[in-house]
Amino acid sequence: MEYIPDLPLSPEFWQSLKDCLVVIDDLWKMAANSTLIGNVFKVYARKVKFSVYITSQFFFEKASESSVIRNNCDHFLLFENYSNQKINKSIVERLDLVKQYKEASSYAYSKPYGYVLITLSRKVARPFAVCSNFFCEDPNNNFIQFFQ
């Protein structure tokens, strides 16, 4: 594990990665305004074979590469948003997963730090796209909750 305090903006850095996970934490504005980071999500991650997670407080914040990043994400981890509940609703409406999200969120958000995981990967069948308790953190429930 390595911590890098700033966003690496060198193509050589991204091309040298393989079989690893990169987490871009709280650098959405900088990442979403970088053509290189847009290419990281669009090209490098698939060709060089590494995974990228990016965190954002506001999913729909506009920037030159924000839609490129959103369109190339396979997984979305949604937490209960007290300040703006419309954000999660807008996300699931765009993904056509409103029914599943309603069920999953009522289960997940009844627990501390509850979340809903949405997977858009073609490797996962659509009925298993929405789940909670993925990491079995609920000691009374050691199985993943899927919502169809």
Report each predicted region and the residues it spans.
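P-loop NTPase motor core of the ASCE superfamily
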Residues: 68, 75-77, 81, 86-148
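Conserved P-loop NTPase motor cores
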Residues: 2-103
